[in-house]
């Protein structure tokens, strides 16, 4: 199972039912809607289509609303474009004017108060660089030197690297978009241009007013956000490392180190983190990714990201399906090369000690030591699954929850496969429900060893306190085990010793009522022994011990109830017999 999650931006190239189905089948876990573009009507159509297709495919796909944020842009230019030439001067006005090579205006009228002489102003993702030469507060104009030539079109982005700006946390448009998202029951809000904790709290205030349980992921895109990351994470559910504007706001050579640090801080807190922007950018135009892009995706996974994101590649590119498949293949390859033992050791040192974390550590270590097939987390809120995920176990994590909302919010968490299953409240019912659901996913089958973890008493969130090692399979009989061995073989039911004569016993488990000295030569050749006679001093027990053969004695009506020529597993340590192959300890 692929563990790293994939976020896909839905746009003109991917909004059809046919393409969304292809993206889901290729590996999309979360659909991102960019509210910098499009109307509420357009986005509602996309949400409805995503949910319709996901339901038809019986897949869980979450929806992420990405706000436009309090960005700064230029106003319109004369004839839609102007040419700025290096060495010339240009005036940036706080009053809206039609842009010319001599003067243009910006949407942020407080820019004049935030910058100072010597500050840099970057236009159109940094393609044009200006340096402030003079500030005229009376005219509301900033005179700048043009440091490099370029064309400037309408409504291009403006960045102020190293400048603390006084933009609001969210705009009125953002607030309207968030209320729309609440109405449409989106799962995540990615908050653009977050600089301080108060920006996140403004969004939380809107969510609390509407009693909405939506996770907030601030996008860190500037130096101020980087500087305040610890305080921002305290009030956030996760994080998006938005490397586009970040690479303009800070020197590009610093972006890789900042990415690693932001991911590490999220890992430490067990909060999901998305790495975004230009991951497979060339696939907007080409059917194959570059080697550098493949390395970028893989290294983000090695850094510890929970999810990787596609933007223009799926929203407007020529090869949206191929981009998702490429992302999936890189993720699977990177995960296969991980040293999960070292990863667990590193995470154990990184994460702070607590009662809940102690369970997570125990589950992850036990899963590694016993090589269990899956970890089944019965969870109301998703916290159990997230707690285990932070330790990056090699085993699959199956999150069984009665809540569709919780299942969708687990779609962003590394290594977690969410499954919706209504269940009863008792502990026994919870455990049985978890095992049955895990089998239904196809990730585990009879004979697999799994770990079940949950909170007891059931129905309460944040109480993860139980771990159970469980063997999936049909137990057909039990008795007193002799020795600690286990064996898998085909049954041979023998009412008398004559039933064993002339038989090849090398792959057989002998099932009989009792034995005497005439049975011994045959038992020596068999894989295992099951008998009805009781006691550790019985002939069967003594022969089993002396010959080192896995044996279970005291099995009631063994000859009658266990069929001939059936593959079984004997677990002598537990005194149990399972039908088929069972991965016993």
From Swiss-Prot:
Glycosyltransferase recorded as keyword: no
Binding site for Mg(2+): 221, 245
UniProt keyword list: ATP-binding, Glycolysis, Kinase, Magnesium, Metal-binding, Nucleotide-binding, Potassium, Pyruvate, Transferase
Top EC class, one word: transferase
Protein residues bound to K(+): 34, 36, 66-67
Domain of life: Bacteria
Residues reported to bind substrate: 32, 244-245, 277
Keyword Magnesium applies: yes
The EC number(s) this enzyme carries: 2.7.1.40
GO terms of molecular function: ATP binding; kinase activity; magnesium ion binding; potassium ion binding; pyruvate kinase activity
Reactions catalysed: pyruvate + ATP = phosphoenolpyruvate + ADP + H(+)
Cofactor: Mg(2+); K(+)
Binding site residues for ATP: 34-37, 73, 156
Pathway(s) annotated for this protein in UniProt: Carbohydrate degradation; glycolysis; pyruvate from D-glyceraldehyde 3-phosphate: step 5/5
Site-annotated residues for Transition state stabilizer: 219
NCBIfam families in UniProt: PRK05826.1, PRK06354.1, pyruv_kin
Family that this chain belongs to: Belongs to the pyruvate kinase family.
Matching PANTHER family: PYRUVATE KINASE
Protein name as catalogued: Pyruvate kinase
Organism annotation: Staphylococcus aureus (strain MRSA252)
Gene coding for it: pyk
């Amino acid at each position: 199972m692929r563990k790293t999650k994939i976020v896909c931006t839905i746009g003109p190239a991917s909004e059809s039912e046919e393409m969304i189905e292809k993206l889901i089948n290729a590996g999309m876990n979360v659909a991102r809607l960019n509210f910098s573009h499009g109307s509420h009507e357009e986005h509602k159509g996309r949400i409805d289509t995503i949910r319709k297709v996901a339901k038809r495919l019986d897949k869980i796909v979450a929806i992420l609303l990405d706000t436009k944020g309090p960005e700064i842009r230029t106003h319109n230019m004369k004839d839609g474009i102007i040419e700025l030439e290096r060495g010339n001067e240009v005036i940036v006005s706080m009053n809206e004017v039609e842009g010319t090579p001599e003067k243009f205006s910006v949407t942020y009228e407080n820019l004049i108060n935030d910058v100072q002489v010597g500050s840099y102003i970057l236009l159109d993702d940094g393609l044009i660089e200006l340096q402030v030469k003079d500030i005229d507060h009376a005219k509301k104009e900033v005179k700048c030197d043009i440091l490099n030539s370029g064309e400037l079109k309408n409504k291009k982005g403006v960045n102020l690297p190293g400048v603390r700006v006084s933009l609001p946390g969210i705009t009125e448009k953002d607030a309207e978009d968030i209320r729309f998202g609440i109405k449409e029951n989106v799962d995540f809000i990615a908050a653009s241009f977050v600089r301080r904790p108060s920006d996140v709290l403004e969004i939380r205030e809107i969510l609390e007013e509407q009693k909405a349980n939506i996770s907030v992921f601030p996008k860190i895109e500037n130096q101020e956000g980087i500087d305040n990351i610890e305080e921002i994470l305290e009030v956030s559910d996760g994080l998006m490392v938005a490397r586009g504007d970040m690479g303009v706001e800070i020197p590009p050579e610093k972006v890789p180190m900042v990415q690693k640090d932001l991911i590490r801080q999220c890992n430490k807190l067990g909060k999901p983190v998305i790495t975004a922007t230009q991951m497979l950018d060339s696939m907007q135009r080409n059917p194959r990714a570059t080697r550098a892009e493949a390395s970028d995706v893989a290294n983000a996974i090695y850094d510890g990201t929970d999810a990787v994101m596609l933007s223009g590649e799926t929203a407007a590119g020529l090869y949206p399906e191929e981009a998702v498949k490429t992302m999936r293949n890189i993720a699977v390859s990177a995960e296969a090369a991980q040293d999960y033992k070292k990863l667990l050791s590193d995470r154990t040192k990184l994460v702070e000690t607590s009662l809940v974390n102690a369970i997570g550590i125990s589950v992850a270590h036990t899963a590694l030591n016993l090589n269990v097939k899956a970890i089944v987390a019965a969870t109301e809120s998703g916290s159990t699954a997230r707690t285990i995920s932070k330790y990056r176990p090699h085993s699959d994590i199956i999150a069984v929850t009665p809540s569709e909302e919780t299942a969708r919010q687990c779609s962003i968490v590394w290594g977690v496969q969410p499954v919706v299953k209504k269940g009863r409240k008792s502990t026994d019912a919870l455990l049985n429900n978890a095992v049955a659901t895990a089998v239904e996913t196809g990730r585990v089958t009879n004979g697999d060893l799994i770990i079940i973890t949950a909170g007891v008493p059931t129905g309460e969130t944040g109480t993860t306190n139980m771990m159970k090692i469980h063997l999936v399979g049909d137990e057909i009989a039990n008795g007193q085990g002799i020795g600690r061995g286990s064996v898998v073989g085909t049954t041979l039911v023998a009412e008398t010793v004559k039933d064993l004569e002339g038989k090849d016993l090398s792959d057989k488990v002998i099932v009989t009522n009792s034995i005497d000295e005439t049975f011994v030569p045959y038992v020596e050749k068999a894989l295992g022994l099951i008998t009805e006679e009781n006691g550790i001093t019985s002939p069967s027990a003594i022969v089993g011990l002396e010959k080192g053969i896995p044996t279970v004695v005291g099995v009631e009506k063994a000859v009658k109830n266990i069929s001939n020529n059936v593959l079984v597993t004997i677990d002598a340590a537990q005194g149990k017999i399972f039908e088929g192959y069972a991965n016993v300890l």
